[in-house]
Amino acid sequence: MERELEALAARLARPAEPPFQALVEAAGGRGQVLLVGELWEREQSRALLRDFARAVFPPEPGAAKPGGAAAEGAGPGAARGAQRAARAAGAAGAAAAAARAIRSPLVFVLCRASSLAAREPRRRLREMLRDVRGRRRAGAALVGVLVAEAGPEDAVAPGLRLLEALLRAVFGRQAGGPVQAAAYCPGLPASCLAVQAAACRALQAAGAGQPVEGAWERPGLPGLLACFSWGPWSRRKNQDVAACRSSAQEDFQEPEEELPLTAIFPNGDCDDLGRGSKACDGVVHTPAEPTGDSR
């Protein structure tokens, strides 16, 4: 009896699970979260996504970095093989659409304050958001994140209003529901809480509580965050489709079929496998045997 009371006291002493973590786990876990960011300079773009993941998704206690064998099982080579099989079966169009689909129950779209302030960068952001809208599961949670310099709250407010207006223009009535906006200031913990709170509102409005049907399955990689930087190559839709389907280019993928993904591990490591890989028309082809990172 005494032991049972001690165990009960220990359980009560433990802090309650944060709502953000609980909602993410209910939606399938952090392995189902997708980060999307602007592509302006490769290393800086990747660093921003990596640092954001570290700040908003702190390392889990005892989380270990997956080994190369586990990463290989879910690597882009497997996706390419599946797509080639689909094309051989005469389902090239359906396979391409499925490959581009975003099945994540929670998507973060990061943009810089400078991109919202000028007309042309803002137009590119709108195009990026429309691309994400067309690929994401209808009604899935999405958080637009304004990346701003640390400063007074009123200094961030104008940029946040611009982002909210852009989200309303692209997502319509979903803005304020499953589509939310938040400001993130690197190095400012309070802004991480604001991003998490926005994600909670989006997940609750989206009715998150069950893993998404048909969501990604990453054997051996339960704590993996996937992210990609969206650049001009992502906008080349439906170009040279017939050429890509020809037998002479059977092994070449359309840009829509393979995105340069940057895997963010729970401990925040983000190694660039692009080194030594081939690049063609903005598409990064990762080696067949990843050494700790995917696209």
Swiss-Prot record:
Pfam families: DUF4630. It comes from the Eukaryota. This is Uncharacterized protein C2orf72. It comes from Homo sapiens.
